[in-house]
Structures are given as C-alpha cells and as structure tokens.
From Swiss-Prot:
Biological processes, Gene Ontology terms: negative regulation of DNA-templated transcription; regulation of DNA-templated transcription; response to xenobiotic stimulus
Keyword ATP-binding: no
GO molecular function: DNA-binding transcription factor activity; sequence-specific DNA binding; toxic substance binding; transcription cis-regulatory region binding
Residue ranges: DNA binding: 33-52
Record has Manganese as a keyword: no
Domain of life the protein comes from: Bacteria
SUPFAM superfamilies: Homeodomain-like, Tetracyclin repressor-like, C-terminal domain
Protein name, entry field: HTH-type transcriptional regulator AcrR
C-alpha cells in the first residue's frame, strides 16, 4: 500500500510539472502563479507546496529533468559506439537539435528558457543556477573533446575550452533562432548537417589551434 501511495505521489508530482510546463509556455513564467498551476492540474495549492518550495523550485525541477535525460542518452550512445567518443558526441548533438522539434516537452522548455522567462524577483535564484549549469556544461564538453583527442579523432592542439564555448553558443543559437521563427529553416531535416559543420570546424579551423610554443 505504501508503495502505491509513493507511486501516486510521484505521478501527481509529474502531472504538476507537465501542467506547469504548458502554462509557462503559454503565459510566460512571471505571469503564471502557483494558484493557476494548481487549478489547471486539478490539485490544491497545498499539494503544490508539498512537492515544491516555490515557483523557482518547480521550474528548476523541470530543467533538471531535461538535463538528466541527456545524461541517460550519453550512456546509451557510449554503449552503441564503444571507443568512439566523437560519434557519441555527434549523435548527442543531433538528438538535442532534432528533439527540440519532435519532443513537445523539450520544445516547450527551450521556448520558456529562451523567450518566456524573466530571471528577476523569485526567479533570480534560477538565473544563478543556470549560470552554474552553463559553466559545468563547458567543463563537460571540454572533457568530451579531450577524450576525442586521446582517441586521435580531433587534432591534438585543439583549443578545447574555446571549442566548448563555441559548441554551446552554436547549438543554443540554432535552437533559439528556430524556436523564434520555425518557418525560417528545417531544423530537424538539417540537424545532422549543422553538427557536421561544427565538427569539421574543429578539424580544420586554424584559429582553434593552440599556437606553437618555442622552448
């Protein structure tokens, strides 16, 4: 019985997150109250506060769920491409772009992040968390690029930090621009080519090479 109750609580929590995601996308984060989320979800405000401290906590949970899915995907591709970190990286980047088009939850989240969230007031704490995630992502990307170098799949003198910054800006920019004007280009159809362009830049761009040092 206790197990069923725990399962029901988890289902209620996920339902609240799904409803909040939809309302945030429709109305913007600052214009959506916890009371509106409770009403739309068919639960009491008390139920909302039982699961989440406040709106920023709820929003952070939505973001963290998205991030955890990427981690699971990485493990899946590592099993599919053992000893081939560049293919793992390529497929993850393609998935990130394609899923922005094909997966409603991810698309709504990206719309909110890029276009429908003001990081002021109670949401200021979320902005700091996003900054921390951004810095952590640079570290993760850089580590992945170093693995590719060790596997002799990228140039040994690649400036990995600069390459990591470029990657995040490039992928984020593609998603943000497509979400703003979906009719302007076919992100799903062209995702693989955009990723190929990025990785070819790492292979061929001289400005991404560490300058030779004279001893």
């Amino acid at each position: 019985m206790a197990r069923k109750t725990k399962q029901e609580a988890q289902e209620t929590r996920q339902h609240i997150l799904d409803v909040a995601l939809r309302l945030f996308s429709q109305q913007g984060v600052s214009s959506t109250s916890l009371g509106e989320i409770a009403k739309a979800a068919g639960v009491t405000r008390g139920a909302i506060y039982w699961h989440f401290k406040d709106k920023s906590d709820l929003f952070s949970e939505i973001w963290e769920l998205s991030e955890s899915n990427i981690g699971e995907l990485e493990l899946e591709y590592q099993a599919k491409f053992p000893g081939d970190p560049l293919s793992v990286l390529r497929e993850i980047l393609i998935h990130v772009l394609e899923s922005t088009v094909t997966e409603e939850r991810r698309r709504l989240l990206m719309e909110i992040i890029f276009h429908k969230c003001e990081f002021v007031g109670e949401m200021a704490v979320v902005q700091q968390a996003q900054r921390n995630l951004c810095l952590e992502s640079y570290d993760r990307i850089e580590q992945t690029l170093k693995h590719c170098i060790e596997a002799k799949m990228l140039p040994a003198d690649l400036m990995t930090r600069r390459a990591a910054i470029i990657m995040r800006g490039y992928i984020s920019g593609l998603m943000e621009n497509w979400l703003f004007a979906p009719q302007s280009f076919d992100l799903k159809k062209e995702a693989r080519d955009y990723v190929a362009i990025l990785l070819e830049m790492y292979l061929l761009c001289p400005t991404l090479r560490n300058p030779a040092t004279n001893e």
